[in-house]
């Protein structure tokens, strides 16, 4: 296991280091590429990440030479030391062509395969020999390279097998007897066609049917429950059902997407509705957090009832007693009233910083103490069923003000529950009055148009609030972190974050930074790299 961790660490270090400096290569590459048909496929565009991170701007050649000297201080073999130094100063000297994307996949033998294109096979030889030397220094068996014509192979323990030639480098990790077969197939099959990932920096592809088969194959299915779940999942998976997830660093934004293709969703047709966003008029534009989704309650109620009465529910052991079925029926009746947007909002939090004297140190600390908050839940409803029943079963906690209008007060919290036409409103220190500066005009409003559902976190509001903004600084001081200015800089970077679904089977999550002109990865690089350099330099001297 120690050897496996070493090889994984070596791959990660080489890949991460390559993002610091990438040089072009004129080596030929395989032109023909195969469609991705693996159960799981992972993609990493190191060249693109390196350029977006602008690492060369923040890491000088002198600093890399200094790190190389530090890394080889205890290496007596001069050839090994020279090769380590050459890799640190230029990571393409490892022999791997990091100007090309690298990827990994789960093959038919349930082994994970790592694939990269080769720039210089001789340099890869030197890199493997260097790794072997370092492993031997650690008291482990060295790595031996076997070569037949242009192909070299090696193994590390029983669970890691590698093979490479002048075109590509492959490593297989697994726990079965098919490692050699896996790596041989990986080395000779065409490279994967990664065009489906577009301009993504990091991405994954999941073949839903193959993953399902791997999870529920015959030797793993040891009871009726697993088999029933597998069969139930099958009805939703089309012939080429797959999921593509990606992470991309853009100017001022970090974008993560998750898209599902060829799934059978006819059963849920009409369940979700596009949000009309009318509720945003009752919310302030500087609200801390907003959750909104469009729903057809009648269909949801039918789906719940269908599931409770299904064979799958019976196999799963969901056996409701009479009282539970009555409660579920009441809940479904309430759900059926929902007909459109449901919105939950946390508009603000108010509090004070209470002084706390430490008698042992003589220091005065400040403890955040929440006094109140403003929050609400709004629903588009088709009738007055919900508010009528809430009023009926409130048991004196709510006082009737008028028809379909209830209120109460607990300390600093004023509770309002009322319905106006088709709007059901429940608020804590909030009422259904139009905001002077509504959330429909907020900086994030343009990002959630034509959505089936979305969630927003407004970092600007959290930071600018006297109470919530001070909590972050207090936490830093309490933790006694050395680089508190760095953490404060990271705090200043964030503007807002949102996740939205413009299609029922597609989701996009975005972190928006206040500087929208500079690539988001470079913004993090500019803050974090100087800290890392300072820390590493300090460890040398």
Please report, for each region that a protein language model flagged, where it lies by residue.
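Single conserved position on a long alpha-helix in the C-terminal lobe of the eukaryotic protein kinase
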Residues: 42, 85-200, 336-455
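Extended, charge-rich low-complexity interaction segments
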Residues: 74-75, 174-181, 227-244, 317-326, ...
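Long, C-terminal catalytic modules of enzymes
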Residues: 431-541
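Broad, structure-driven detector of short, well-ordered beta-strand segments within folded domains
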Residues: 104, 160-165, 231-252, 342-346, ...
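Short, hydrophobic/proline-enriched secondary-structure or compact coil segments at domain edges
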Residues: 168-171, 243-263, 372-380, 424-427, ...
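Structural boundary/hinge residues at secondary-structure and domain interfaces
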Residues: 6, 15-152, 196-238, 254-365, ...
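Positively charged n-region of N-terminal signal peptides that target proteins for export
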Residues: 1-4
């Amino acid at each position: 296991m120690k050897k496996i961790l070493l090889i994984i660490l070596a791959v990660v270090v080489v890949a991460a280091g390559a993002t610091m400096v990438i040089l072009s290569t004129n080596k030929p590459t395989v032109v023909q590429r195969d469609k991705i048909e693996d159960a799981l496929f992972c993609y990493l565009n190191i060249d693109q990440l390196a350029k977006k991170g602008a690492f060369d701007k923040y890491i000088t050649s002198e600093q890399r030479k200094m790190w190389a000297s530090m890394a080889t201080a205890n290496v007596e073999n001069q050839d090994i030391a020279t090769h380590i130094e050459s890799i640190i100063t230029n990571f393409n000297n490892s022999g791997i062509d990091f100007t090309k994307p690298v990827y990994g996949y789960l093959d038919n033998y349930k082994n994970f395969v790592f694939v990269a294109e080769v720039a210089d096979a001789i340099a890869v030889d030197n890199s493997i020999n260097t790794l072997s030397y370092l492993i031997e220094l650690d008291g482990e068996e060295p790595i031996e390279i076997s070569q037949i014509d242009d192909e070299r192979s090696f193994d590390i323990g029983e669970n890691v097998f590698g093979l490479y030639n002048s075109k590509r480098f492959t490593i297989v990790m697994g726990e079965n007897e098919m490692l050699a077969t896996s790596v041989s197939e990986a080395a000779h099959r065409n490279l994967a066609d990664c065009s489906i990932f577009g301009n993504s920096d990091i991405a994954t592809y999941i073949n839903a049917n193959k993953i399902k088969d791997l999870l529920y194959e015959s030797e793993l299915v040891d009871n009726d429950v697993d088999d029933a779940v597998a069969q139930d999942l099958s009805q939703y998976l089309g012939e080429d059902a797959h999921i593509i997830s990606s992470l991309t660093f853009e100017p001022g934004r970090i974008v993560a997407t998750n898209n599902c293709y060829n799934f059978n969703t006819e059963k849920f047709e009409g369940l979700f509705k596009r949000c009309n966003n009318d509720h945003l008029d009752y919310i302030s534009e500087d609200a801390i957090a907003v959750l909104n989704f469009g729903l057809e309650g009648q269909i949801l109620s039918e789906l719940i009832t269908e599931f409770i009465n299904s064979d799958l529910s019976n196999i799963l052991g969901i056996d409701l007693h009479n009282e539970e079925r009555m409660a579920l029926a009441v809940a479904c009746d309430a759900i059926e009233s929902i007909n459109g947007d449901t919105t939950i909002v946390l508009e603000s939090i108010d509090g004070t910083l209470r002084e706390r004297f430490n008698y042992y140190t003589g220091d005065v600390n400040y403890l955040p103490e929440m006094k109140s908050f403003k929050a609400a839940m709004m629903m588009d409803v088709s009738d007055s069923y919900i508010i009528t029943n809430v009023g009926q079963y409130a048991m004196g906690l709510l006082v009737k003000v008028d028809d379909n209008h209830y209120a109460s007060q607990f300390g600093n919290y004023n509770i309002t529950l009322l319905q106006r036409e088709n709007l059901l409103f429940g608020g804590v220190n909030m009422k259904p009055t139009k905001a002077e500066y509504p959330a429909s005009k907020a900086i994030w409003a343009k990002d959630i148009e034509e959505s089936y559902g979305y969630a927003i976190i407004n970092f600007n509001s959290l930071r600018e609030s006297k109470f919530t903004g001070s909590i972050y600084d207090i936490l830093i001081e309490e933790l006694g972190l050395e680089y508190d200015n760095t953490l404060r800089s990271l705090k200043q970077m964030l503007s807002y974050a949102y996740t939205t679904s413009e299609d029922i089977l597609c989701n996009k999550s975005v972190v928006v930074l206040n500087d929208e002109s500079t690539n988001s990865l470079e913004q993090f690089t500019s803050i974090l790299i100087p800290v890392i350099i300072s820390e590493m330099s300090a460890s040398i001297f």
